[in-house]
Amino acid sequence: MMDNQAVKSLLEMGIPHEVAVDALQRTGGNLEAAVNFIFSNELPEQAEMGEENDGSQPRISENKIVAGTKPCDVPNNGDQDIDMPDVSGVDVDYDDDEDITDERSGSNSTSGCRVTAQNYDRYSISETSIPPPSYSIVQHNEFKSNVGDPTVVLPLPLNSLIESYFGLFALLTAVYFPHVFLKPDFKDLNYRADWFKGSSFTEPKYRLAYCEAEDGSTTSEIVLASGPNEGLQPHLLWQLQKLISVVNTRKCERAFVSAKVFTSSLEPQLRSKLADSEHLYEVLPAFIKSLAVDLEMCPGIRDRETRSLFISSALHTPNKNEPPMETFLSLFHFLPEEYDSNLYKMFNVLLYPEEEEEEEDVIRGGEQEEARYVEPENTLKEVAPVLTILFNELETNTESVSLPNGVDIPLEFYPQLYTKQCKDQLIRHIISKRKQARTRSRCLLQEINELKSYQGKNISTILESTLAYLQTIPDDANNEAAKQIASLKDTLNSARAAKMEEYKDLASKLHGEWNLSHPETHIINTAKQLGLIENPYILTMAALSPYSYFIRSRNGAWSWIQSNTLGTEFKVKKCSSPSVVQEAIKHGTKYASETPLMFIYCEEGKIPTEEVVAEALKSNSGCLKFAEDDQNSLKTLRSQFFDGMGDPEQATNNINNGNDNDNDDDIDSDN
């Protein structure tokens, strides 16, 4: 058991309770080792070996329901024992947008996102898991029973896992940046009643035509097509505009759209890239770039205008003796071994390498001059309004990963803390202060220990024993000696108390105003006061897998969508509070996941209002017509139900009974 006195001792030093408990757990209750770990991040050899040799930790999270929780408290990752046809994926190379974190992954495993159904059978849902949803496409439940529910993007089977994430990214774009992609108006998107299935691709009646200007540049215009396509056409944009039309129409009744809508329109290079990729992080940047390039083909859109929406810039220094090079990235990705207790800690390791170097220097007892600071290995230059973060999936060579509390993904994130401007004007100063505080704290601990004991004996105990002895023989000499010893004791106590107060003050600052792992406690406010950061980035999507994802509406309401691995059944549940999403993420990140996890943040100031979206949709005649055609198609389908059932009221009830996913109770935040 943990020694309560040890916890109390750390609390008296100004260490937060959770930090104290964690440090004692890591060091087996050893107080001295715990203090050393807190300020130097150095574990005793035995503790480190114990962690390395612990092979008993599970590597797969089966998302079993914990006793006492409600069935809806734990997300279902969609794993089920099913047979399915073998659907092959297809598609190519974009070197522009290489992720600067690629160099860190170093993974050459042959197992990737293209997982077969047989592999998933080993991790089938247990009897205590959430029952499979009962929303059946076979029953033609294309209608929402509540028009306020989000339109769902249904995933593809497991052997097309990566493509399912394409659909989720497109959905996020359709919800949060429709006004950007509604700028080109193709007049008539050529509606077909089965468009939402993605089984076929239909081109609009108006397409792009290219002409060469006098200066040699090429311009485009939207014209009525008179024959076969000549030149590049924005196939992916057309499909995205169809989705935008539906999800942003008020009182839309379209319940779902298949992710196949987007895979059917991938251009050849992207198909080739997809065929050669084993991991989502390898091919998602190409999909994002393809979306942007499609829009930039259109008239009135400046080159690279759209790419800046998704693609951030960074400064990368491969060698400290070389100047930094600008590079571009559309996502960050982390290996399971790089999971940490919160997202800021994970970014710190990636983008604050000097912090790690300073810790090592303190451990060695060395000193570094301020002038030795050089450009960090990686730093952000500009952060795009859309920030995509991937947690890589479990692989055969993945080390055992176990985080008892999972990863804390904040609802509001400030990636601006990792820009060069913020690091130069604030973070370097904090890192320097942290280094000095750690060095001083270690000295104080040593000095306090020297004032407390000598050759393993407690000095206060010796002085008290001596005083007690002298007081048994009351003569002038002994009385004088007793006064001197009492004075010495008071001096020692005062010196110890002063050093302890200084130590507590440093500890408070390290875990408060200089805490890089929890910048929300102080650093973010300081950065705002200095004008270095403004808007937070809002968590808008959390995909634990394509079969279990959370999405936030523009007004802040969260929904949880679950589906089976065939993409034929799904459930929609309303979340009673955002904390439900955070708890689900923590549960899903306690161990390495079988599928990639995707988190998407959007800059608060760039999220459009309902009025802006409505105006953009109203101004695009092609999308407006498509939305009307889709709603008319659903009305026709509903009338066919009426004709078949005889009683219109009964027919409506039958449709709504099939949509029982829309009538589930809200997910309670009280677990």
Curated annotation (Swiss-Prot):
Region named Disordered: 68-87, 643-671
InterPro entries: Rup1_UBA, UBA, UBA-like_sf, Ucp6/RUP1
Domain UBA as annotated: residue spans: 1-41
UniProt keyword terms in alphabetical order: Coiled coil, Cytoplasm, Nucleus, Phosphoprotein, Ubl conjugation pathway
Pfam families associated with the record: UBA_7
Primary localization class, coarse: cytoplasm
A single BP term in Gene Ontology: positive regulation of protein autoubiquitination
Protein localization: Cytoplasm; Nucleus
GO cellular component, one term: cytoplasm
Domain of life according to the entry: Eukaryota
SMART domains recorded: UBA (SM00165)
Biased composition (Acidic residues): 661-671
Residue positions where Phosphoserine is found in the record: 56
Record flagged with keyword Transit peptide: no
Coiled coil residues, start to end: 432-501
Cross-referenced Gene3D superfamilies: DNA helicase RuvA subunit, C-terminal domain
More info: Present with 5930 molecules/cell in log phase SD medium.
Role description: Modulates the activity of the RSP5 HECT ubiquitin-protein ligase through its mediation of the interaction between RSP5 and the deubiquitinase UBP2. Involved in regulation of cell wall homeostasis.
Subunit structure: Forms a ternary complex with RSP5 and UBP2.
Protein name according to UniProt: UBA domain-containing protein RUP1
Lineage: Eukaryota, Fungi, Dikarya, Ascomycota, Saccharomycotina
